[in-house]
From Swiss-Prot:
Cited InterPro entries: Globin (IPR000971), Globin-like_sf (IPR009050), Globin/Proto (IPR012292), Haemoglobin_extracell (IPR014610), Mb-like_M (IPR044399)
The species this protein was found in: Oligobrachia mashikoi
UniProt entry keywords in alphabetical sequence: Disulfide bond, Heme, Iron, Metal-binding, Oxygen transport, Secreted, Signal, Transport
Residue ranges annotated for the Globin domain, each copy included: 17-156
Disulfide bonds: C18-C146
Family recorded in the similarity comment: Belongs to the globin family.
Any one of the GO CC terms: extracellular region
Localization: Secreted
Sequence positions that bind hydrogen sulfide: C79
Span of the signal peptide: 1-16
GO MF annotation, one: oxygen binding
Record protein name field: Extracellular giant hemoglobin major globin subunit A1
Length: 156
């Protein structure tokens, strides 16, 4: 009976979106790819460059933050704010109440920006493209599950 209960718990855990094991993996891989302070600006700009390669129309969404010069201080600062928020959310994946409050706050901020599901999907593709270039091994399934948790929390 004890084995059956443990097995049932493992099945539930494995079927959960962004389960505990996936959370640990994503946190570890994010820390490796996001790197240290001196590398974060380049990493962040690379993420946005890839976003614009995937969805060129999204570039217009950033006209107010200096996107015309992707190496400008204004655009770099914006990129760092976005990846800083992503860093914060990834660190909260195992803290349901905290991440839910943070996602609700970010959803409120993004509601007025006329974003749709395709914008969040494109950012997810950019993450899935850039993060692995900084790793020896990348778990696409775990990242897909955990990014979906974040994106759906912001986009509603």
């Amino acid at each position: 009976m004890k084995v059956l209960i443990i097995f049932a718990c493992l099945v539930v855990m494995a079927s959960a979106v962004c389960n505990r094991l996936e959370q640990i993996l994503v946190k570890t891989q994010w820390a490796q790819s996001y790197g240290e302070a001196e590398n974060r600006a380049a990493f962040s700009r690379d993420l946005f460059s890839e976003l614009f390669n995937i969805q060129g129309s999204s570039r217009a969404l950033f006209s107010g933050v200096g996107v015309d010069d992707m190496n400008s201080a204004a655009f770099t600062a914006h990129c760092l704010r976005v990846t800083g928020a992503l860093n914060r959310l990834i660190s909260q994946l195992d803290q349901q109440a905290t991440i839910n409050a943070d996602l609700a706050h970010l959803a409120g901020q993004h509601a007025s920006r006329n974003l749709d599901a395709s914008n969040f999907a494109a950012m997810g593709q950019a993450v899935m493209s850039v993060v692995p270039t900084h790793l020896d091994c990348f778990n696409q399934h775990a990242w897909g599950e955990c990014y979906e948790r974040i994106a759906s929390g912001i986009s509603g």
